[in-house]
């Protein structure tokens, strides 16, 4: 059986868990408590010398980095797919571009907002909060535009959508309504929330907010 080493509030681990659920793959979840420094233990560093989760161990294969793990799962367990068909290289590129956008220009910003909001109200940097709000709002406006006439970002449900899901689910608790005045984003989120793989993340929202 596969093993997934993960910290439940981690959005990158959540990406992998969505894919595992979509593919109905069974695995053993081994929780790595980042707050307790489990990621720096020698036995974990042997799996990932960069001391980061998630890490997937599938028999004799060890893979780290959420994007690489998902690509491995897609190659090894192709059905059902989470990437567009190989016959559509343009759509596959679009899906990967949006996953990268989520990883670099959305998830980190929401994480920084979570960290700032975790401070006592009088200690929050209001200027930083405003900058983070603007950055996230711009990303949501862009997504609203890119979803025009589409149910998902790259054809069918794919890694393009999966990359955004973990942090989209916490925005409401941070005072941001992703779908407000963004009908395409609003409908997109509702479609994703119909999927059991996404519904399973809702239970860890509180953990994510508490674990910053």
What are these regions (language model features)?
Residues 90, 102-196:
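GST-like fold's C-terminal all-alpha helical module
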Residues 37-38, 74, 189, 209-211:
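Short secondary-structure boundary/hinge segments and terminal tails
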Residues 34-35, 185, 206:
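Conserved beta-strand edge residues that scaffold enzyme active sites
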Residues 68, 184, 197, 203:
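Residue-level recognition of oxygen-bearing side chains
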Residues 1-130, 144:
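GST-like domain detector, emphasizing the conserved glutathione-binding G-site
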Residues 46, 194, 203:
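Phosphate-coordinating loops and pocket residues in cytosolic domains that bind phosphorylated ligands
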Residues 201-212:
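Terminal-tail/helix-coil boundary detector
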């Amino acid at each position: 059986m596969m093993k997934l080493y993960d910290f439940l509030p981690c959005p990158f681990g959540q990406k992998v868990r969505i894919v595992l659920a979509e593919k109905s793959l069974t695995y053993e979840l081994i929780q790595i408590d980042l707050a307790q420094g489990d990621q720096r233990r020698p036995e974990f560093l042997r799996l990932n010398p960069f001391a980061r989760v998630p890490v997937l161990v599938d028999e004799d294969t060890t893979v780290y980095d959420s994007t690489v793990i998902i690509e491995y799962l897609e190659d090894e367990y192709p059905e059902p797919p989470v990437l567009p068909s190989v016959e559509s290289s343009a759509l596959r590129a679009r899906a990967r571009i949006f996953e990268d956008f989520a990883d670099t220009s959305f998830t980190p910003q929401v994480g920084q907002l979570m960290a700032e909001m975790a401070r006592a109200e009088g200690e929050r940097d209001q200027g930083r909060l405003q900058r983070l709000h603007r950055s996230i709002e711009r990303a949501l406006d862009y997504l609203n535009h890119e979803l025009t006439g589409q149910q998902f970002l790259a054809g069918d449900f794919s890694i393009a959508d999966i990359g955004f899901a973990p942090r989209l689910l916490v925005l409401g608790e941070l005072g941001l309504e992703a779908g407000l005045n963004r009908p395409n984003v609003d409908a997109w989120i509702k479609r994703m929330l119909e999927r059991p793989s996404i519904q399973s993340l809702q239970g860890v929202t509180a953990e994510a907010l508490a674990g910053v």
